[in-house]
């Protein structure tokens, strides 16, 4: 149900007339996901959850009050990047703690989160004017990105064949995903973000 709320909500965000209902549906989807998680029967540290909600709420209000509407794209880029970083940190914590979770799933979460983090911060830098807003392209750029992505796939295959230590694979994926996030974002001009 929450996934449907997210998907329909995101779809409705694509048009100004339906954006409000899209935002509501996506928020409702998130609420359902949170309630489902908290009522799943798992043992949670409610103090930490309350602390996280409290800190997040305070920071959210402070940011919302200070950010002007013209700075909204930059704020979205930062929040997107922080969401990616959170995903990468959760995957890293699961890996370091020796979680029973699938190693491949942890690596994929790390890959997506790290790629999102680096790409979003390049987008923020372009939108904010910290780096050139022009598209940065060079010969062989797409081949380089394909090689990096292929290397990540090869590392996951190497894990399945027990060819490399898990630590080597995990940390190499982190570096490659950071590079790929940058490589995929720099050719996009600031006006197109």
Please place each PLM-identified region on the residue numbering.
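Structural signature of hydrophobic alpha-helical transmembrane segments
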Residues: 1-3, 23, 40-58, 102-117, ...
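N-terminal, positively charged regions that mediate nucleic acid binding
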Residues: 1-34, 40
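C-terminal ends of transmembrane helices
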Residues: 5-18, 57-76, 120-135, 180-190
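Cytoplasmic-side transmembrane-helix entry/capping segments in multi-pass membrane proteins
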Residues: 18-29, 49-52, 71-83, 135-145, ...
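Core segments of transmembrane alpha-helices
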Residues: 30-31, 145-153
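Alpha-helical transmembrane segments of multipass membrane proteins
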Residues: 34-38, 61-62, 153-157, 181-185
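Transmembrane alpha-helix boundary signature
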Residues: 37-50, 62-73, 88-101, 126, ...
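Mid-bilayer segments of alpha-helical transmembrane spans in multi-pass integral membrane proteins
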Residues: 57-62, 81-96, 106-122
């Amino acid at each position: 149900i929450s996934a449907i709320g997210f998907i329909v909500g995101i779809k409705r965000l694509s048009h100004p007339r339906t954006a409000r209902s899209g935002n509501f549906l996506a928020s409702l989807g998130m609420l359902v996901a949170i309630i489902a998680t908290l009522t799943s029967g798992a043992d949670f540290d409610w103090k930490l959850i309350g602390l996280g909600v409290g800190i997040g709420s305070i920071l959210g209000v402070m940011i919302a009050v200070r950010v002007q509407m013209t700075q909204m794209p930059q704020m979205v880029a930062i929040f997107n990047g922080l969401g990616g970083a959170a995903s990468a940190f959760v995957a890293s914590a699961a890996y370091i703690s020796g979680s029973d979770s699938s190693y491949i799933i942890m690596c994929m979460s790390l890959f997506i989160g790290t790629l999102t983090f680096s790409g979003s911060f390049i987008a923020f830098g372009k939108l904010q004017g910290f780096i050139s807003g022009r598209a940065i392209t060079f010969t062989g750029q797409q081949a380089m990105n394909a090689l990096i992505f292929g290397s990540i796939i090869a590392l996951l295959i190497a894990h399945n064949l027990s060819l490399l230590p898990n630590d080597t694979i995990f940390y190499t994926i982190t570096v490659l995903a950071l590079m790929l996030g940058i490589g995929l974002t720099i050719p996009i001009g600031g006006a197109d973000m």
